């Protein structure tokens, strides 16, 4: 029986899940917005929120814990130097999940996960698609 077992398996082994969540967290910290399936977005949210809380703590031990989780010192530096000060006055709730329809092909529910007060200059996947499509429309109309 599966009583009180938290988290989704997502049809992956434990090591695959751990690597996938680390990669998704790195992408989310880099772009501040990613498009993924809804179950993956719901699973990655507590992981990244915990990392932002580590960044707010700011000590050497917290930095080493974040590096152990992310495996990318550059993204940990952005987490501690850019994102943590931005959310210094906010107690949790750093991420937003918005439903984004269904994927063509397998009809999987998609979602956009992004930081709440994100920097719009750090273009995420949705912004990149939007700007490319508007540029293509301008070229086609002229």
UniProtKB/Swiss-Prot annotation:
Protein name according to UniProt: Large ribosomal subunit protein bL17
Encoding gene (name): rplQ
Record-level GO BP terms: translation
Molecular functions per Gene Ontology: structural constituent of ribosome
InterPro entries referenced in this protein's UniProt entry, alphabetically: Ribosomal_bL17 (IPR000456), Ribosomal_bL17_CS (IPR047859), Ribosomal_bL17_sf (IPR036373)
Keyword Ribosomal protein annotated: yes
Signal sequence, start to end: none
Keywords: Ribonucleoprotein, Ribosomal protein
Entry-linked Gene3D superfamilies: Ribosomal protein L17
Annotated GO CC locations: cytosolic large ribosomal subunit
Family statement: Belongs to the bacterial ribosomal protein bL17 family.
Organism: Bartonella henselae (strain ATCC 49882 / DSM 28221 / CCUG 30454 / Houston 1)
Database matches in Pfam families: Ribosomal_L17 (PF01196)
Keyword rRNA-binding found: no
Record note on quaternary structure: Part of the 50S ribosomal subunit. Contacts protein L32.
């Amino acid at each position: 029986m599966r009583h009180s077992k938290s988290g989704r398996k997502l049809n992956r082994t434990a090591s695959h899940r751990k690597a996938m969540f680390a990669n998704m967290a790195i992408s989310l910290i880099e772009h501040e917005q990613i498009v993924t399936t809804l179950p993956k977005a719901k699973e990655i949210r507590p992981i990244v929120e915990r990392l932002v809380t580590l960044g707010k703590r700011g000590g050497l031990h917290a930095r080493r814990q974040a590096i152990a989780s992310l495996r990318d010192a550059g993204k940990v530096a952005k987490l501690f130097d850019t994102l943590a000060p931005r959310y210094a006055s906010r107690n949790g709730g750093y991420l937003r999940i918005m439903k984004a329809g269904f994927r063509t092909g397998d009809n999987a529910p998609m979602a956009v996960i992004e930081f709440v007060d994100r920097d719009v200059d750090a273009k995420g996947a949705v912004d990149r698609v939007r700007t490319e499509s508007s540029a293509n429309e301008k070229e086609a109309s002229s």
